[in-house]
Swiss-Prot record:
The modification Phosphohistidine is found at residues 10, 181. It holds the Pfam family EIIA-man. Residues 2-130 form the PTS EIIA type-4 domain. PROSITE patterns: PTS_EIIA_TYPE_4, PTS_EIIB_TYPE_4. The keyword Cytoplasm applies. The active site is at 10 (tele-phosphohistidine intermediate), 181 (pros-phosphohistidine intermediate). Residues 143-161 are annotated as: Hinge. GO terms for cellular component: cytoplasm; plasma membrane. The keyword Cytoplasm applies. This is PTS system mannose-specific EIIAB component. The PTS EIIA type-4 domain is phosphorylated by phospho-HPr on a histidyl residue. Then, it transfers the phosphoryl group to the PTS EIIB type-4 domain.
């Protein structure tokens, strides 16, 4: 029994840091690299992880060093771990070179060490490896941790109670095949100033594992919920959500249309990512559609919904129907 290491990242960062680790520590056995490229979807990444694990011995424990908490590599590694409860796996995010070197060191120094001990040592070393020069730029460590006290209402709020103005605030509504992942957690959530993420999907609401992964992928200070479309429609009309500022995530434009037709007030829909599949045409490098998708967007347009085609907030807005026309979807 040993420890197999998977280095995982958005783009080719994992390949580069693997090469850097080899320059410093020499070539290592039982190391696999998983990269998530712009033209790939979650299922591609899921397959990459499963292929990587198959390269290790059946009794090897698995250590995943991923780039970003709540990013797609983390999410798919969590999915694989959840589907293999008998296989010891640990996932550490914040990938840097000190982390990788320490992982190699831990394996070399104590071949019998369990993955729990190895992970604890790696986390400490990867944090200690972040330093600044001049030294006075380094933050002073607090002697006692600052604890936030959150006052929450105990028990259910009675139906009919009006909070604030009684209207759910939809700060951002987005179509994204990947739902809650790194770009949404680290870019769109703060940009939208949302205090709650609502994933509205009948499919995901019935999948306990995916619900768990989405909840743990939420950024600090923001709650994530997974609900069927009907529950989103109910919540949009419930005065108890008057102080909620929500980021709504739809897996498909069809789900967004159902919500709007059910009375959810969405004035603008951010179209961020639609994964490619058989029968669909690439509209740009992250959007893939078929005639049904186009018809759905046309219905949304007829319901006075406008569209913001951007993968991340810093992108310039694109015109959805100009992209569709150029793609010549048949």
């Amino acid at each position: 029994m040993g420890i197999g290491i998977i280095i995982a990242s958005h783009g080719k960062f994992a390949e580069g840091i693997h090469q850097s680790g080899s320059m410093i520590f020499g070539e290592q056995e039982k190391v696999q690299v998983v990269t998530f490229m712009p033209n790939e979807g979650p299922d591609d990444l899921y397959g990459h992880f499963n292929n990587a694990i198959q390269q290790f011995d059946a009794d090897d424990e698995i250590l995943v060093l991923a780039d970003l908490w709540s990013g797609s590599p983390f999410n798919q590694a969590s999915r694989v771990a959840g589907e293999n409860p008998d296989r010891k796996m640990a996932i550490i995010t914040g990938l840097n070179l000190p982390m990788l070197i320490q992982a190699y060191t831990e394996r070399l120094m104590d071949a019998g060490a369990g993955i729990e001990q190895v992970a604890a040592n790696i986390i400490k070393e990867s944090k200690d490896g972040i330093k600044a020069l001049p030294e006075d730029l380094n933050p002073v460590e607090e002697t006692a941790a600052t604890e936030k006290v959150v006052n929450a209402l105990q028990g259910a709020i009675p139906a009919g109670t009006v909070i604030g103005d009684g209207k759910l605030k939809i700060n951002l509504a987005r179509v994204d095949t990947r739902l809650l992942h790194g770009q949404v957690a680290t870019a769109w959530t703060p940009a939208s100033k949302a205090d709650r993420i609502i994933v509205a999907s009948d499919e995901v609401a019935q999948d306990d594992l995916r619900k768990q992964l989405i909840k743990q992928a939420a950024p600090g200070g923001v709650k994530a919920n997974v609900v069927p479309i009907s529950k989103l429609i109910e919540a949009s009309k419930d005065p108890r959500f008057g102080n909620t500022h929500a980021l709504i995530l739809f897996q498909t434009p069809q789900d967004a249309l159902r919500a709007v037709e059910g009375g959810v007030e969405i004035n603008e829909l951010n179209v961020g990512s639609m994964a490619h599949s058989t029968g669909k045409t690439m509209v740009n490098n992250v959007l893939s559609m078929d005639k049904e998708d186009v018809a759905t967007f046309e219905k949304l347009r007829d319901l006075s919904v406008t569209f913001d085609v951007r993968k991340v907030p810093n992108d310039s807005k694109k015109n959805l129907f100009e992209l569709i026309q150029k793609a010549n979807i048949k």
